[in-house]
């Protein structure tokens, strides 16, 4: 297995874990389950997300693809999508109760729609806006 395929595997597993954890945490929060505020929910997701970020940066370096360049407009769009996904996930989980329950319920499926767009950009490498 090459280092690129190893990095790609780590990246894909991190994506699956990150989305699974977001979904689980949202469901626990929505059900008002005591585990929603457990210590592991504050430790594990940031570790997984950091691994996801680092593997993504390593993949960009290994493939010699840079965002904000003419050849990789899809990657630029993907990065903006990731930022939108993070904001929507933050609203959906909102532990500080800054947003209403309705806003959280709307933000979660929107985050999943943005995730779908990110996956389409990554697999097709065809920019949506370009």
Swiss-Prot record:
The keyword Transcription does not apply. It is a multi-pass membrane protein. Residues 29-39, 94-104 are cytoplasmic. Belongs to the SirB2 family. It is found in: Cell inner membrane. The chain crosses the membrane at residues 10-28, 40-59, 74-93, 105-124. This is Protein YchQ. Keywords: Cell inner membrane, Cell membrane, Membrane, Transmembrane, Transmembrane helix. The lineage of its organism: Bacteria, Pseudomonadati, Pseudomonadota, Gammaproteobacteria, Enterobacterales. It comes from the Bacteria. It holds the Pfam family SirB. The gene is ychQ. Its main location: membrane. It comes from Escherichia coli (strain K12). Residues 1-9, 60-73, 125-130 are periplasmic. GO terms for cellular component: plasma membrane.
């Amino acid at each position: 297995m090459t280092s690129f395929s190893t990095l790609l595997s780590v990246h894909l597993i991190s994506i699956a874990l990150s989305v699974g954890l977001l979904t689980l945490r949202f469901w626990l929060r929505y059900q008002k389950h005591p585990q929603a505020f457990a210590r592991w929910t504050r430790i594990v997701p940031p570790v997984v997300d950091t691994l996801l970020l680092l593997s993504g940066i390593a993949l960009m370096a290994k493939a010699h693809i840079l965002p904000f360049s003419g050849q990789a407009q899809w990657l630029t769009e993907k990065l903006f999508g990731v930022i939108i996904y993070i904001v929507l996930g933050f609203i959906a989980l909102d532990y500080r109760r800054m947003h209403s329950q309705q806003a959280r319920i709307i933000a979660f499926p929107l985050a999943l729609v943005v995730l779908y767009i990110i996956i389409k950009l990554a697999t097709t490498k065809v920019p949506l806006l370009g």
